[in-house]
UniProtKB/Swiss-Prot annotation:
Lineage per the UniProt record: Bacteria, Pseudomonadati, Pseudomonadota, Alphaproteobacteria, Rhodospirillales
Protein name: 7-cyano-7-deazaguanine synthase
Species for this entry: Rhodospirillum rubrum (strain ATCC 11170 / ATH 1.1.1 / DSM 467 / LMG 4362 / NCIMB 8255 / S1)
Annotated residues for binding of ATP: 14-24
Binding note for cofactor: Binds 1 zinc ion per subunit.
Signal peptide: none
UniProt keyword annotation of Metal-binding present: yes
Length: 241
């Protein structure tokens, strides 16, 4: 459905994790009517979709769509294949190369879906919570990638060619540390107990505490002198530090 002249709709990619939830909060704070897009892509940590539902309900988004695409058909990642998730890696090691948790072309696939929905809604804005500081070295989280995709998007769409709408991809977290991201979210009232970040959760959905995503999350809470409110394996929660 097209939007009214006074309504600003945005597509926000929402995984259910810490970064995407903060991004959703930022989009709403900037006055956008949010349509949230999540993906069931055969991920090892499918429990994140329950977190995405909790988050989008808490923020009362206009609509939440969970698109289904089975990337297990290709594999090639610890998140979609029978490859072990790296544990207890140092921050230096995380930044030294592209890890096996990288899902080939995932953000390109996700942003393409977001672009298609944005055209239908006549929305000019897409938000994605990529980060190029405290991250695991994924190539599709870099500023130059986002810039290139935005250029492509405006060349590849009816609205872009006709000049009736210019798409902007917003990356409000791209230059923030994990600690800064958490502080921004807390200032906006985000309840991080609703979120899920772990790549290798237990059968009960508890975070492992040792994968890259958990370690970066714990680092962010420690930087704020706070305890992470989610449950970890072997403990009710994980204290800062």
């Amino acid at each position: 459905m097209p939007h009214s002249p006074t309504q600003r709709r945005a597509i926000v990619l929402v995984s259910g994790g810490l970064d995407s939830t903060t991004t959703l909060a930022i989009a709403q704070a900037e006055g956008f009517t949010v349509n949230a897009l999540s993906f069931s892509y055969g991920q090892r940590h499918a429990v994140e979709l329950e977190a995405a539902r909790r988050v989008t309900q808490a923020f009362a988004v206009e609509r939440h769509v969970i698109a289904t695409i089975d990337l297990r058909q290709f594999g090639g990642s610890a998140l979609t294949d029978s490859i072990g998730v790296p544990k207890q890696r140092s921050l230096e090691t995380m930044g030294a190369g592209i890890p096996v948790t990288y899902v080939p072309a995932r953000n390109t696939v996700f942003l393409s879906f977001a672009l298609a929905w944005a055209e239908v809604l006549e929305a000019n804005d897409v938000f994605i919570g990529v980060n190029a500081l405290d991250y695991s070295g994924y190539p599709d989280c870099r500023p130059e990638y986002i810039s290139a995709f935005q250029t492509m998007a405006n060349l590849a769409t009816k609205r872009g060619v006709e000049g009736t709408g210019v798409l902007t991809i917003h990356t409000p977290l791209i230059a923030l540390t994990k600690g800064q991201i958490i502080r921004r979210g807390l200032d906006l009232g985000v309840d991080y107990a609703l979120t899920h970040s772990c790549y290798d959760p237990s059968a009960e959905g508890e975070a492992c505490g040792t994968c890259d995503s958990c370690l970066l999350r714990l680092k962010g809470f420690a930087e704020n002198g706070l305890e992470d409110p989610v449950r970890y394996v072997g403990a009710r929660s994980r204290a800062a530090g």
